[in-house]
Amino acid sequence: MDEQSQDASTWSAYIDEFARWALGEALWWESNPDENGVGGDEWEAVEHVTVADIADDRARERWMQMCREFVEMNKEHLALLPAESAGQLFWQSKRGRWGVPGRSFRVDKRLPKRARRALHRASSRWPVGYVFIRDEKVHFEL
């Protein structure tokens, strides 16, 4: 395998993991709010969920497109982070003031300050609505 093919394969795997962990973070944070409107499942309730569990084919394609575009636009900075962390940070940054500030790109010290700001701002480009699990499938508005 030549270097270019290996690089493409590596980033393809990164995108898949990024998408899975971003979805897990979204479900952990957003789904099944309690009676006070506080969102979130226990992590154990959502850690098994994958992108394949997104019920609607178009929504699944759009989710992957969003993740792919974000990763491809920010490879230089994301190369400093494992896909798991980057996916989780992406979702919280994406939520902006409705996310958990301590779990966003803005505060991750593994990144230079300029990269933290750039990734945090870039995360808000794609609108995603409410996320929930029903009948073992993921549903959300894209």
Model-derived segments and spans:
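Long, contiguous N-terminal structural blocks used for assembly/anchoring
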Residues: 1-81
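Amphipathic protein-protein interaction modules
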Residues: 61-137
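Non-transmembrane, interaction-prone alpha-helical and coil segments associated with secretion
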Residues: 141-142
